[in-house]
Amino acid sequence: MASLAALLPLLALLVLCRLDPAQAFVNQHLCGSHLVEALYLVCGERGFFYTPKSRREVEELQVGQAELGGGPGAGGLQPSALELALQKRGIVEQCCTSICSLYQLENYCN
C-alpha cells in the first residue's frame, strides 16, 4: 500500500504547477505501479476494487479468440458485435492498453 509520504511529491508537483488534478490525469496510459498509484490518488480513503485476471484466465481468453477467428484476415468466424460488447473490459484494458481518464479511474473506487 502506497503511503501518504510517497504521494506527497506528486501532490506538491500538482500544486506547484497549479494543475487541476482532473486535467493532470486526462487521457493517460497507466500501467503497473503507475496505475495502482493513480488509483490510490484518485480514490483516497475510499479505496479501490481491483482483481487482476489470473494467467490461466488470460490464456483461456486468447485461445477463445484464436478459435473465433485467428486474427484479421484469417478467414475464421468473426465475433459478433454482441459478443464483443459482452466481453468484460477491465482497468488494464482501459488504462494500460488504451488510454483512460480520471473519470474512468473513479469507476474502480469503492
From Swiss-Prot:
**InterPro entries linked:** Insulin, Insulin-like, Insulin-like_sf, Insulin_CS, Insulin_family
Positions of the propeptide removed during maturation: 57-87
Gene encoding the protein? INS
Q: Where in the cell is it found?
A: Secreted
Assembly and interaction partners: Heterodimer of a B chain and an A chain linked by two disulfide bonds.
Gene Ontology CC, one term: extracellular space
The disulfide bridges present are 31-96, 43-109, 95-100
Gene Ontology biological process terms, A to Z: cellular response to oxygen-containing compound; glucose homeostasis; glucose metabolic process; positive regulation of protein secretion
- Quote the protein name from its UniProt record: Insulin
| Family, per entry | Belongs to the insulin family.
| Entry's Gene Ontology molecular function annotations | hormone activity; insulin receptor binding
KW Secreted (keyword) present: yes
Superkingdom of this entry's organism? Eukaryota
Q: So what does this one do?
A: Insulin decreases blood glucose concentration. It increases cell permeability to monosaccharides, amino acids and fatty acids. It accelerates glycolysis, the pentose phosphate cycle, and glycogen synthesis in liver.
Q: Which residues form the signal peptide?
A: 1-24
Q: Which UniProt keywords apply?
A: Carbohydrate metabolism, Cleavage on pair of basic residues, Disulfide bond, Glucose metabolism, Hormone, Secreted, Signal
Origin species, per record, is Oryctolagus cuniculus
The record's annotation in Pfam families points to:
Insulin (PF00049)
